C-alpha cells in the first residue's frame, strides 16, 4: 500500500518537474525581448553601419573593413586615443590616492567630523555643466582665482586649459575635485568595516601610524580600492560633458578624447559609417581596460576577505 502511494507521488512529482520549465517562459520572454531591443540590436546595427560608408544624405555603401583600416592612419584618432589613456590614468590615480587619504582622515574622530564630511562630498552632487562653468572662470588667466593663488605663493601664472601642454592636467584637476569624494566614501566604508582588534594589537606592539596603515588597513581595503578604481576607470574613459563644456577638445585638439572625436565625426562631419567603427573600437578599448584591471586584481590576489599576497 505504501509502495503504491510512493509510486503515485513520484509520478505526480515527475509530471510537475516535466512541465515546470514551460511555466518560466512567460517571465523570461519579456526580459529577452528587452535585452534584444535595448542592447543586442543597437550593437548589431552599429557593427553593420561600421562596415559601410554612410554619410548623411546618401545611401550606405558596403566597404567591408575599410573604416577600421582607416583608423590607424588617422592621426587625429590616434592622438585622441593617447589623450584618453592619459586622462583616464590620471583621473583614476589621483582620486584613489586623495580619496584614500581623506577616508583615513575622516575615519578618525575629531570635532565637527560629520559637518566636514558633508562639505567634502558636495562636489559629486553638482551637475557637470555647473562645474564646468565655475571651473572655466577659475581657470581664466587674468581673472581666475587659481592664478591669484599661485601669485600669493610666488609661483608664475598658468594658462591652464588655454594652453595645449596644460589642458589635460587642468581637466584632470576638475575630475579629481569632483570624484575624490566618491572614492572617499567607498574606502571609508571599508575602513569602518575593519574590526578594532588588529589595531589594538598593533598599538600594543608599538606600531607607528604608517605601519598600522600599511600592514593592517591597506590590505583590508584592497577590495574596496578595486571597486573604486573600476568605477572611476569606466567613468573617466567615457567622460564627455565636462571636457566638452570647458575646452570642446581644444586648444586645437590638445584635449580631444575619443568621445569628443567621435562626436565631431558623427555630428559635425556626418560620417556615420566611420563614427560607428570608432564606437566599436572604443567599446573594445573599455573592455580591454576593464580586463586589465581584473587581471591586476587576480595577479595581486585581491579577495573578498581583503588582503594582497
Each PLM stretch: what is its role?
Residues 19-309:
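A structural signal for multi-pass alpha-helical bundles of membrane permease subunits
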Amino acid at each position: 500500500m505504501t509502495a503504491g502511494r510512493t509510486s503515485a507521488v513520484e509520478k505526480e512529482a515527475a509530471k510537475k518537474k516535466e512541465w515546470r520549465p514551460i511555466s518560466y517562459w512567460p517571465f523570461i520572454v519579456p526580459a529577452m525581448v528587452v535585452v534584444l531591443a535595448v542592447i543586442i540590436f543597437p550593437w548589431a546595427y552599429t557593427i553593420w553601419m561600421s562596415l559601410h560608408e554612410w554619410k548623411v544624405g546618401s545611401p550606405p555603401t558596403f566597404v567591408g573593413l575599410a573604416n577600421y583600416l582607416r583608423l590607424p592612419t588617422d592621426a587625429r584618432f590616434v592622438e585622441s586615443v593617447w589623450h584618453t589613456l592619459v586622462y583616464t590614468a590620471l583621473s583614476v590615480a589621483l582620486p584613489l590616492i586623495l580619496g584614500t587619504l581623506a577616508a583615513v582622515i575622516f575615519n578618525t574622530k575629531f570635532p565637527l567630523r560629520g559637518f566636514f564630511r558633508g562639505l567634502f562630498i558636495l562636489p559629486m552632487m553638482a551637475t557637470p555643466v555647473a562645474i564646468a562653468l565655475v571651473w572655466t572662470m577659475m581657470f581664466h588667466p587674468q581673472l581666475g582665482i587659481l592664478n591669484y593663488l599661485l601669485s600669493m605663493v610666488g609661483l608664475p601664472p598658468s594658462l591652464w586649459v588655454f594652453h595645449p601642454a596644460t589642458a589635460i592636467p587642468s581637466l584632470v584637476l576638475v575630475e579629481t575635485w569632483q570624484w575624490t569624494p566618491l572614492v572617499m566614501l567607498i574606502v571609508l566604508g571599508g575602513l569602518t568595516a575593519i574590526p578594532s582588534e588588529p589595531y589594538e594589537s598593533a598599538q600594543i606592539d608599538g606600531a607607528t601610524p604608517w605601519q598600522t596603515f600599511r600592514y593592517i588597513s591597506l590590505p583590508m581595503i584592497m577590495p574596496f580600492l578595486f571597486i573604486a578604481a573600476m568605477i572611476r576607470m569606466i567613468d573617466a574613459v567615457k567622460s564627455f560633458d565636462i571636457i566638452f563644456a570647458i575646452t570642446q577638445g581644444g586648444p586645437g585638439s590638445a584635449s580631444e578624447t575619443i568621445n569628443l572625436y567621435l562626436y565631431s565625426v558623427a555630428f559635425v562631419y556626418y560620417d556615420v559609417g566611420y563614427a560607428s567603427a570608432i564606437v566599436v573600437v572604443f567599446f573594445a578599448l573599455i573592455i580591454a581596460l576593464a580586463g586589465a584591471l581584473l587581471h591586476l586584481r587576480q595577479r595581486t590576489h585581491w579577495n573578498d576577505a581583503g588582503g594582497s599576497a
